[in-house]
Amino acid sequence: MTLYMVFDALERGKLKLNQRLKVSRRAQGMAPSKLGLRRGQTITVKDAILALITKSANDVAVVVAEALGKTEINFAKMMTAKAKSLGMRKTRFRNASGLPNRRQISTARDMATLARRLIKDYPQFYHFFGTQRFSYKRRTYRNHNKLLRAYPGVDGIKTGYIRASGFNLVASTKRYGRRLIGVVFGGKSAKS
């Protein structure tokens, strides 16, 4: 949903791909998956998109949240409202990164709805989800979505992992003229 909000802001002219977003102390302190941004540094919106897609960078998620919502809590409220407007009836966000929070919840159906709406509403940005590698500050990060490399036709969308729910995946492919979206929650390993 964080990326949906970024694409929405780009579409409405609130952000530009080359715009630089400032890193706060809170963003710097995020763990465990991060780029290692430091307070006072900046990152372009385009690099932020790629870092979120390939690395699931939690520090970058907070940078984006603060740029769009002033605070991460306010941004989470904005995401929840947007989710409801998209028909994601059982989703509540409490942070921008997807890190554990007892009151943050979603369903496979709602994540499939989000994927479908990302593809439909922002086709001009969907290609980012097919990014296999992202280089930033002399480091290269590989996309965690190994299906991009393993299965012809898979063109996105996003992986995730937290201890509470295990390995999660929303994947999409276009075959025989039809778009297929699959959602898996609770995998015991990335391979499963």
Identify the residue ranges that each predicted region occupies:
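Active-site-adjacent loops and short helices of periplasmic peptidoglycan-processing enzymes
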Residues: 1-109
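Domain-terminus/edge residues, biased toward the C-terminal soluble/receptor-binding domains
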Residues: 88-92, 100-105, 109-192
